[in-house]
């Protein structure tokens, strides 16, 4: 559990020209995933500021969450047409953006970039499937050439789609940023069972919780970890039993005072859930 304390972090926006680690320290943490959706920030000057500021703050950047240009609609109606590198209309521009973020990530010294690939087709004989695999492979190979991994954030795909896609990409540096809430909120799987299918590829966890969809067009609701359907004590136990040693990045998709309260509560809960794991015979 002492080890877990050094692996709990938050999502931290890339702001202030790269000098942006005060929020991490405010929670008493030493780890974050840095995130930006503005690829114009992917400059050497900002990267060097990030590296210096992180070193000064004593914060480790677990990975860089790489947002991409163009529209993003987080539902089941427009989502397949707008999210990730699945939509052909945005694919080339987004692959290029991910490569720029990979250069940025290599310069700041973080091990991986993360993104949502989108609603990858369930049917592997769909003519749209192979080009998506090729695009993921292009980004993954670019990352590999720079000593980076490419982590796909779970959510818009079933676990078996993720598995077969990783197998087909075949670059050896693909992992998962495992967001258990997204599997539930998108209605794509039970996260605890999903580890049977993709557990070997889990590199980072988003500590997020949510409910299953109750409308055919909209995602389920996101809630504070412990209040949704993830069953965190069981998930933490299964991950640790499988030998997971990565980071636990808390994500609470609200803003203001309640977000801060919820994050502080989740830090305490994570330590408690992990301690319960330690005390078992």
Please provide the spans of the model-predicted regions:
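Active-site beta-loop-alpha junctions enriched in small/polar residues
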Residues: 11-15, 35-37, 66-69, 118-120, ...
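Acidic (Asp/Glu)-rich catalytic clusters
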Residues: 21-27, 44-65, 100-109, 141-145, ...
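Glycine-rich, proline-tolerant flexible connector loops at the mouths of alpha/beta enzymes
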Residues: 33-54, 117-124
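Acidic/histidine-rich catalytic cores of soluble enzymes
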Residues: 31-32, 64, 133-229
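Active-site acidic/histidine proton-transfer and metal-coordination neighborhood
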Residues: 18-22, 73-175, 280
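Hydrophobic faces of well-ordered beta-strands that scaffold small-molecule active sites
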Residues: 6-12, 32-34, 61-66, 113-115, ...
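C-terminal helical cap(s) of enzyme catalytic domains, especially alpha/beta-barrels
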Residues: 259-278
